[in-house]
Amino acid sequence: RLTNEDCKVLKYCTDMVALDLGHNKVTDLSFLEYMPELKILILVDNWLTDTQSPYLYDLSMLKYCPKLMYLEFFVGDVSDISVFDYLPNLVDLNISYNPISDVSHLLNFTKLERLYIEHTSLTEQDYELLKETYPDAYIVYYGEGSVDQGWREHERYFAMIDMFHNNYVNDLFKN
């Protein structure tokens, strides 16, 4: 598993468009300050066993990634999502299994198409507000798995996987 120390060199990848750090031991995202072109970021299930808060809990460095379109961040310890105010271009967002309770930072996306918020601290009223705010978006509030109900069955998911395997940027992520 990659660690915080391993990821320090990522700050030199200033043209990075897609980054998968899922299922590692990364909780320091300071390298994101140098990735303004990033459009895809996977931070699923990052944890340390020797800290008081074993899961990744601070997403504040995402503010340096304004072009971010796809954020897969489930199974964490994030409660403060105010950084989402800096991410107007999010299209796909999965923040399931995080103790998120403030819906206000989820209400200003201009391009949102998919939002997964299973097992968060958001209320039924928050869910209804999100459905009103994004009537054309697919929003998952109920479920028993962070990738159930189609998260990994969407064309952007398959395009992203192909990008990782073949080292190119798919047209779906060029906008």
Locate the predicted segments by residue.
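Concave beta-strand-loop units of leucine-rich repeat
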Residues: 1-27, 31, 37-79, 83, ...
